[in-house]
Amino acid sequence: MNILQEPIDFLKKDEIKNIDLSQMSKKERYKIWKRIPKCELHCHLDLCFSADFFLSCIRKYNLQPNLSDEEVLDYYLFAKGGKSLGEFVEKAIRVADIFHDYEVIEDLAKHAVFNKYKEGVVLMEFRYSPTFVAFKYKLDIELIHQAIVKGIKEVVELLDHKIHVALMCIGDTGHEAANIKASADFCLKHRADFVGFDHGGHEVDLKQYKEIFDYVRESGIPLSVHAGEDVTLPNLNTLYSAIQVLKVERIGHGIRVSESQELIDMVKEKNILLEVCPISNVLLKNAKSMDTHPIRQLYDAGVKVSVNSDDPGMFLTNINDDYEELYTHLNFTLEDFMKMNEWALEKSFMDSNIKDKVKNLYF
């Protein structure tokens, strides 16, 4: 991991009006996307890796000796898309094969932070599920957490704090060790390290877990849960429960808010931000195409949205790919992107001193 990188010349607001993206090649645009000071709120640390990193883990542990590199990537990852969120979750569970020991988990955290820095992210909220990382090899969640915190801290310090990183804890469903109550207890035990609490995995109506989420929220940990992502669900109950029962401050994905004017009005009134993950939504078939992705409708309706990469290891993408897609297919401008990042900064769960520093430096 080569820490020595050219510093990024981040865009200033007064520069934007002089940049004509329409006259640029794709390669030139990517240089601009990198220069946007990005605040990313929704990325799963346990699914944030490059193809090279993932393949090195597979080969190190001799996991698929009879498969070529291309076959390994097809077997585990979702870069070519699929049929549904359910299919994605099943593949993500396969990826837990690489969580073989604490060394690889620490290395994963280091690479994730460094790659986000190279992409031009200045404020990064990673989230991870202790039980998901632990379940395949029965690892100790305390030692997992120590490895992740150590890896993040080491790289942030090597980068002279040019990227600010925080963690959210996920209580999930969909694998044998999933236990939302245990994850909530773990989150509160390590509240010095976690800035928020989430639910991930299969999208379910979380009102059945109201007491657990109340317990976390009333203990001072804000909530952002996955809801309004899975278009195969027959109704919008997950969104209503997240907003009215759990009293979340943000929603992971939330794109199905676009299906209800009542929900649009509700998230605006309650100042709830939607952590939108455009490429993820298309690859999981929760949006039919990027041209028809609901983020355009939501943004135009005045809903606060931000741009996120979700599971870049599964998709073999990075956050700048999402910006390119939104520009190319939905005509979002640099001004729009700067506004979305200001919203993300405003709604970040990080300490106000860090947020003020980022705001003064970049916005």
From Swiss-Prot:
Inhibited by coformycin and methylthiocoformycin (MT-coformycin). The keyword Zinc-finger does not apply. GO terms for cellular component: cytosol; external side of plasma membrane. Residues 170-184 are annotated as: Gating helix loop. The keyword Zinc applies. Pathway: Purine metabolism; purine nucleoside salvage. It holds the Pfam family A_deaminase. Catalyzes the hydrolytic deamination of adenosine to produce inosine. Unlike mammalian adenosine deaminases, also catalyzes the deamination of 5'-methylthioadenosine (MTA), a by-product of polyamine biosynthesis, to produce 5'-methylthioinosine (MTI). Plays an essential role in the purine salvage pathway which allows the parasite to use host cell purines for the synthesis of nucleic acids. Binds 1 zinc ion per subunit. GO terms for biological process: adenosine catabolic process; hypoxanthine salvage; inosine biosynthetic process; negative regulation of adenosine receptor signaling pathway; purine ribonucleoside monophosphate biosynthetic process; purine ribonucleoside salvage. This is Adenosine deaminase. The gene is ADA. InterPro entries: A/AMP_deam_AS, A_deaminase_dom, Ado/ade_deaminase, Metal_Hydrolase. The record marks D172 as: Important for substrate specificity for S-methyl-5'-thioadenosine. Its cofactor is Zn(2+). Keywords: Hydrolase, Metal-binding, Purine salvage, Zinc. Belongs to the metallo-dependent hydrolases superfamily. Adenosine and AMP deaminases family. It comes from Plasmodium cynomolgi (strain B). Its EC number is 3.5.4.4, 3.5.4.31. It catalyses: adenosine + H2O + H(+) = inosine + NH4(+); S-methyl-5'-thioadenosine + H2O + H(+) = S-methyl-5'-thioinosine + NH4(+).
